[in-house]
Design a protein with these regions (language model features):
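Short amphipathic alpha-helical coupling segments at ligand-binding clamshell hinges
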Residues: 3-7, 97
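Short, flexible turn/loop "capping" segments at secondary-structure junctions
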Residues: 72-79, 103-106
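A general structural motif
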Residues: 60-68, 86-93
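Terminal or standalone catalytic/regulatory effector modules within metabolic enzymes
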Residues: 101, 105-108, 119-123
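C-terminal segments
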Residues: 6, 10-58, 114-175
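Short, well-ordered beta-strand elements within core beta-sheets of diverse protein domains
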Residues: 79-89, 110-114
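Helix N-cap motif at beta-to-alpha junctions
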Residues: 1-2, 90, 118-119
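Alpha-helix capping/termination and helix-coil
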Residues: 50, 54, 86-106
């Protein structure tokens, strides 16, 4: 966990304090819906909306949270450079949280995992079996890997992603 956190920091991400996390919660979701004012904005702009001072060069705002319940604003799709980071005590707990996020966020879309796919094939297969998603990305950025092309040549490039029967769609591939 700490190694990943340090790598995020090294790459220009900003970890929010507890107070800053709470302030950003009040900006992410407004009246039960994603706040349109954060969509596509920079991390610096979003932080400013929450009254948080971060360097202009900040790439991503990260809140360390525990809950994956819908009541946790960080557990929603945010369409912006805002991430939740979860610390778990076991692989099983990580998979359970991932399953819940997929369930609440929408079956069929995309899941991703960073793993040594040569030495941890059993773990990878378990992940693939448990995630009810049409795209399971391995060791690639999920936001760009899911749309194909630059980070993933195995998927047709598209900004329209089918979610298959899990998501109530007629197609499961990139359209």
């Amino acid at each position: 966990y700490e190694d990943v956190k340090n790598e995020f920091i090294r790459r220009g991400c900003y970890f929010l304090s507890e107070e800053e996390t709470e302030a950003l919660r009040n900006v992410i979701i407004i009246n039960g819906s994603l706040n349109a004012r954060i969509v596509g904005q920079t991390a610096h702009t979003i932080a400013s909306l929450a009254g948080i001072d971060v360097p202009k060069t900040t790439k991503i705002l990260i809140g360390e949270v525990e809950s994956v319940d819908l009541s946790e604003e960080f557990a929603h799709e945010k369409l912006s450079p805002v991430l939740a980071m979860y610390k778990v005590s076991s692989l099983s707990e990580a998979f359970e949280k991932a399953e819940r996020l997929v369930k609440d966020g929408g079956f069929g879309h995309t899941s991703s995992i960073y793993i040594n796919d040569r030495t941890e094939t059993a773990t990878l297969l378990e992940f693939a079996e448990r995630m009810k998603t049409c795209r399971i990305l391995v060791n690639t950025p999920s936001s760009f890997g899911g749309i194909g092309d630059v980070y993933n040549f195995n998927l047709a490039p598209s900004l329209t992603l089918g979610c298959g029967s899990w998501g109530g769609n007629s197609v499961s591939e990139n359209v």
